[in-house]
Amino acid sequence: MQLILISGLAGSGKSIALNVLEDSGYSCIDNLPLTLVPDTVERLAPLGYEQLAISIDTRDGASRLLEVIHALETAGHNVRFLFLEARTDTLIRRFSETRRRHPLSRTALTIPEAIARERQLLQAIAGLGHRIDTSDLSPNQLRRYLRDVIAQAPGRMLVVIQSFGFKHGVPLDADFVFDVRCLPNPYYDPALRPFTGRDAPIINFLTAEPLVQAMADELSGLALRWIPVFRHDNRNYLTFAIGCTGGQHRSVYLAETLAARLRETGETVLLRHRELDR
């Protein structure tokens, strides 16, 4: 069985994720306690369920998640785990807009306190799967991103390469963060400013800069050196985030370059430009 487990912070988009999976042909179960997952899967497998997505409640059993995933994999199921999160200010705004109560606010906590408490409870499992920071994603952007994620072949490690602008904050879901603000900046050339790192004028400018090419070589070398190590550690996802000031030129160019080089070696790569996708 192809099995996708979904967890994360309240308000981070778990319901949207489940809807995307349902539209993609998965049978879906919402808000199932973690302790019931193994028995539920074993009961459904003989009935012909080939693709199952479960949004799990892990606040009371986070410490057992790795054990549950291992047991499911031992039973022959292909398991992927998605963890959705967002910045606190984003979550507060979403709860304000929807006028929903945070699940932990019933314990007399304010919304910021409830978010902080839930983040603490789930901290141990955030790194066990594919972390997805939804802070800067609209519902439609999140749907597109998730469709790209689930389209990847199960059983292979997915390398996510993301460009971003430091002025908009560092992505929460990055395993590696590279600061390339030290490189020559085409922004200061008025003729180049309107373009992005995917456009020929910027590509030509940055390709001609020795420091930029040295950075591209170093990033590629580091990625190629360490991806096999993470794969050997049974990681399903690995995220590289490359940041410049605004996320328009240098980081986009280097993310495109790194993605192309990794694809040439046979890696499964998902490329995302956070600021261009806004």
From Swiss-Prot:
Belongs to the RapZ-like family. ATP binds at residues 8-15. Transmembrane segments: none annotated. GO terms for molecular function: ATP binding; GTP binding. Gene3D superfamilies: P-loop containing nucleotide triphosphate hydrolases (3.40.50.300). Displays ATPase and GTPase activities. This is Nucleotide-binding protein LHK_02029. GTP binds at residues 57-60. InterPro entries: P-loop_NTPase (IPR027417), RapZ-like (IPR005337), RapZ-like_N (IPR053930), RapZ_C (IPR053931). NCBIfam families: PRK05416.1. Keywords: ATP-binding, GTP-binding, Nucleotide-binding.
